[in-house]
């Protein structure tokens, strides 16, 4: 018997963060990469997270994106957060296990001086990968995706 879709599909949670107003972009990046990320990575791996990435979007990149958007007729909303954290896992139990880890609570407390608590943004969904390492993947010989149907995949975790 196959595992339920809630155990097979890869979930992606993103949390977009804004830095504290008195922290420079460079100091924020230095803190994230020099202090926070290595400790967080070990903690997340210990608790079953399959992937953990941090995406940085400094003002210079946001400005460039705004210019690109304007050149294309402004079809997009250009988000203005400083960094987005991505977590990949198979089920919400994995997320809850990590979130309830006492070490995670310590990690979150250390964020206080750097990350604004006023407005963070979160999203959760599933991942369908179609190109990996420059190669087309998960497409059958019939040219159709090999993923289960939307009705199965869209059952909330």
Where are these regions (language model features)?
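Macromolecular interaction modules
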Residues: 1-157
């Amino acid at each position: 018997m196959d595992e339920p879709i809630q155990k097979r599909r890869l979930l992606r949670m993103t949390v977009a963060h804004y830095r504290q107003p008195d922290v420079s972009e460079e100091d924020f990046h230095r803190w994230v990469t020099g202090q926070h990320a290595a400790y967080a990575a070990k903690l997340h791996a210990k608790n079953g997270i399959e992937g953990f990435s941090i995406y940085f979007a400094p003002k210079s990149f946001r400005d460039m994106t705004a210019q690109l958007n304007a050149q294309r007729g402004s079809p997009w909303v250009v988000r203005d957060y400083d960094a987005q954290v991505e977590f990949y896992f198979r089920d919400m139990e994995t997320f809850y296990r990590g979130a309830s880890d006492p070490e995670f609570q310590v990690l979150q407390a250390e964020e206080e001086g750097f990350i604004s608590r006023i407005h963070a943004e979160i999203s959760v969904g599933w991942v369908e990968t179609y190109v990996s390492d420059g190669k087309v993947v998960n497409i059958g010989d019939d040219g159709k995706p090999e993923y289960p149907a939307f009705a199965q995949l869209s059952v909330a975790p």
